[in-house]
């Protein structure tokens, strides 16, 4: 969907409300053709209709959402000037602390926990008058690539409910693809926004590390985690990106730098003269031929738009996966030590006779799932005396080499492109017992996390009726380049196929 609905909002009745873009929804609300309550009720009705099948949501706050929508309508009626996303419904990944809603991180160890404060991104969404529908399903503590690691059951892909939606932000992606919400917020540690975006036919963006606050984001890997948007269009993603970005003194890793002009870039749609580098290392064995064909067609479209396309080598990208699976579990081992049964969350075996260590052990055994335990053990081992330098230390050196690859590449080109994932969505259960095969789903996305730069996944086409994506990567704090290239390519691909890709998603 590439239409610019801001200037020409579609009135209710001519198009199903839940299928409107976020920009179109906001524009219709702003001029009174649609109320925020109507938009919210439409989303809630859609959730009631399809979410038993999709299982995108862990918690739906219907009362809170409708109250927020009424506030938007009342203030608009009073003549108050509202923001560009006022009244637009949104699904929130259940990894952000949210006052008034449970925050579980997809884990039994936090089941029923209600945080007393909002994450900064949640506060900014409320300030922007975005309507929070509820909390979306996810792999436990964001550890996974399929959303099968959720303690509360898997989410299903709206394109084929026998297949995974990707992960760890699979609930957020499925909610948008199933037209339960026009927008969703996810997190990306090694591809957890971009991979599900690709597998569900969406736009997903990992902003520059430090560009969006992590305060209130329950940490998996602190040097890699980043919040970002999932949407049906590049412009919608840009509007959400702009709403959550900016310096936050509550986050020590937040960078005090100007927010890139992502909305203007998304609407520019002119990439003549831009230099685009195709990453040589992301092709060949392990890549589905259909994925490679869709990627080649997208690259051809970039050439047709006037971009200068060249091949670029990033030789250390091939070491990204093993480096990531030492760094991320090491940080996870440290971060998840806070779940000790003493301060919040689950407590098992506290019979008045057991000591604190025994209670903690029983609680963590009962509360953490298999993948979380696997990564804690791996990280603890990598950080242990005698192994730190050989494993964690070496992985950090590889991380530096990958950052240097990016620096060298961006001296030659403005952006890099690759497939987002090696394959389309695979069947539920197909890789649960093969962790390495599961980890390979993030082969193309991990380098941007290790280097801290921004990256976007954009729908590139269908393979056997399933969506796949093209990834666009840019230098740190050049997030606007993603949107400039993404907006132009989205329009070209939609024109080429005669309609937005999501028009082909099967009805549920």
UniProtKB/Swiss-Prot annotation:
It is an enzyme of class 6 (ligase). One of its GO terms (cellular component) is glutamyl-tRNA(Gln) amidotransferase complex. The keyword Ligase applies. Signal peptide: none annotated. It catalyses: L-glutamyl-tRNA(Gln) + L-glutamine + ATP + H2O = L-glutaminyl-tRNA(Gln) + L-glutamate + ADP + phosphate + H(+). Transmembrane segments: none annotated. Pfam families: Amidase. The active site is at residues 93, 168, 192. PROSITE patterns: AMIDASES (PS00571). Keywords: ATP-binding, Ligase, Nucleotide-binding, Protein biosynthesis. HAMAP family: GatA (MF_00120). Belongs to the amidase family. GatA subfamily. This is Glutamyl-tRNA(Gln) amidotransferase subunit A. It comes from Frankia casuarinae (strain DSM 45818 / CECT 9043 / HFP020203 / CcI3). The lineage of its organism: Bacteria, Bacillati, Actinomycetota, Actinomycetes, Frankiales. The gene is gatA.
């Amino acid at each position: 969907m590439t239409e610019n609905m801001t200037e020409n909002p579609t009135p209710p009745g001519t198009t199903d409300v839940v299928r409107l873009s976020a920009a179109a929804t906001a524009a219709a609300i702003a001029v009174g053709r649609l109320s925020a309550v109507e938009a919210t009720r439409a989303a809630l009705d859609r959730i009631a209709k399809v979410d038993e099948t999709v299982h995108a949501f862990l918690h739906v706050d219907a009362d809170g959402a409708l109250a927020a929508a009424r506030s938007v309508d009342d203030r608009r009626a009073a003549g108050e000037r509202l923001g560009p996303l006022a009244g637009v419904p949104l699904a929130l990944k259940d990894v952000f602390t949210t006052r008034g809603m449970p925050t579980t991180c997809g884990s039994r160890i936090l089941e029923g926990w209600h945080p007393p404060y909002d994450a900064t991104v949640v506060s900014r969404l409320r300030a922007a008058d975005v309507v929070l529908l509820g909390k979306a399903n996810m792999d436990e503590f964001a550890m996974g690539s399929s959303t099968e690691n959720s303690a509360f059951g898997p989410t299903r892909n709206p394109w084929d409910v026998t297949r995974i939606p990707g992960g760890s932000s699979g609930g957020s992606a499925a909610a948008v693809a199933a037209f339960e919400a026009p927008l969703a917020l996810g997190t990306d540690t090694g591809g957890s926004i971009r991979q599900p975006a690709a597998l569900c036919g969406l736009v997903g963006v990992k902003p520059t590390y430090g560009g969006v606050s992590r305060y209130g984001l329950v940490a998996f890997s602190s040097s890699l985690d980043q919040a970002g948007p999932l949407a049906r269009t590049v412009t919608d993603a840009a509007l959400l990106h702009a709403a959550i970005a900016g310096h936050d003194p509550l986050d020590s890793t937040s960078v005090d730098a100007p927010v890139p002009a992502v909305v203007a870039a998304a609407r520019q749609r002119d990439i003549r003269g831009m230099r685009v580098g195709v990453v040589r290392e992301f092709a060949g064995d392990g890549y589905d031929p259909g994925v490679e064909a869709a990627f080649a067609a997208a690259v051809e479209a970039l050439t047709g738009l006037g971009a200068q396309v060249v091949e670029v080598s990033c030789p250390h990208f091939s070491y990204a996966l093993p480096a990531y699976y030492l760094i991320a579990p090491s940080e996870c081992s440290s971060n998840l030590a806070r779940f000790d049964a003493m301060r919040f969350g689950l407590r098992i075996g506290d019979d008045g006779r057991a000591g604190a260590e025994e209670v903690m052990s029983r609680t963590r055994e009962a509360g953490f799932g298999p993948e979380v335990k696997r990564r804690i053990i791996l990280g603890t081992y990598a950080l242990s005396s005698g192994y730190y330098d050989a494993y964690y230390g070496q992985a950090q050196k590889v991380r530096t080499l990958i950052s240097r690859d990016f620096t060298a590449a961006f001296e030659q080109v403005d952006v890099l492109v690759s497939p987002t994932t090696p394959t389309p969505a695979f069947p539920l259960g197909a890789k649960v017992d093969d962790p390495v095969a599961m980890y390979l789903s993030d082969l193309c996305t991990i380098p941007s996390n290790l280097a801290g730069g921004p990256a976007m996944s954009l729908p590139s086409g269908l393979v056997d009726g399933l969506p796949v994506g093209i990834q666009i990567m840019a230098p740190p704090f050049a997030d606007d380049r993603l949107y400039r290239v993404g907006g132009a390519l989205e329009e070209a691909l939609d024109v080429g196929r005669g309609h937005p890709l999501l028009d082909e998603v099967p009805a549920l």
